[in-house]
Amino acid sequence: MPKMKTKSALKKRVKVTATGKIKREQAFRSHLAQNKTKKQKRQSRKASFMKRSDFKRFKFML
């Protein structure tokens, strides 16, 4: 059976760390920022890690 292809859309949006975690950027940053609080905008600058439940679904795509 041939190897599964990596999903290009996911490959462009995430990075896999050395420990195997999936690192991603926060959503809701691109526009309409005047409606968001300072705290929301500041916290969305940090990257976050994918939750374990999501990781189980996405590991087959990478």
Swiss-Prot record:
Alphabetic keyword roster: Ribonucleoprotein, Ribosomal protein
Which cysteines does the record link by disulfide bonds?
A: none
Gene Ontology BP annotations:
translation
* Tagged with keyword Phosphoprotein: no
Q: Which GO terms describe its molecular function?
A: structural constituent of ribosome
Q: Which GO terms describe its cellular component?
A: cytosolic large ribosomal subunit
Cross-referenced PROSITE patterns, in alphabetical order? Answer: RIBOSOMAL_L35 (PS00936)
Family classification: Belongs to the bacterial ribosomal protein bL35 family.
**Which protein is depicted?**
Large ribosomal subunit protein bL35
Q: Which organism is it from?
A: Mycoplasmopsis synoviae (strain 53)
Its gene name is: rpmI
